[in-house]
């Protein structure tokens, strides 16, 4: 999107806070339904980040696949489960929660210090000029198709085989 810099920065901060709040909601909310809705918020904010970075195809795929299918499947699975078993042994804070939060906080602090200590201006971003001219004539979906059929052919085929095995396994489990 061609937005002015203050509007772009405001949307970036707004979507980032939505991502952080949604992620905290996924982890901290005791009700699984609310946690699934928070996951939906995280996935929607992620797709809006893709729209801000002019990746419209990836944003549409994110919305259709993750929000439209995966998150709805999670919500249906949670709704079919017995909700009363979640509140039987609900303790507010356990030792495992403390250890996990300390590990997460230490990882977060190390990530922040690594990002702030990195000299980003020393990195040279190089591209070929003819590659930029060629990419101007192609849409995002055409570029994705070209890269999937040339540069990423083997990983694309391996992922399709893994998904096929997972689908066959799910059918075998569902039959029993």
Curated annotation (Swiss-Prot):
InterPro entries: NAD(P)H-Q_Oxidoreduct_6, NADH_UbQ/plastoQ_OxRdtase_su6, Nuo/plastoQ_OxRdtase_6_NuoJ. The keyword Magnesium does not apply. Its EC number is 7.1.1.-. GO terms for molecular function: NADH dehydrogenase (ubiquinone) activity; quinone binding. It catalyses: a plastoquinone + NADH + (n+1) H(+)(in) = a plastoquinol + NAD(+) + n H(+)(out); a plastoquinone + NADPH + (n+1) H(+)(in) = a plastoquinol + NADP(+) + n H(+)(out). PANTHER family: NAD(P)H-QUINONE OXIDOREDUCTASE SUBUNIT 6, CHLOROPLASTIC. This is NAD(P)H-quinone oxidoreductase subunit 6, chloroplastic. It comes from Solanum tuberosum.
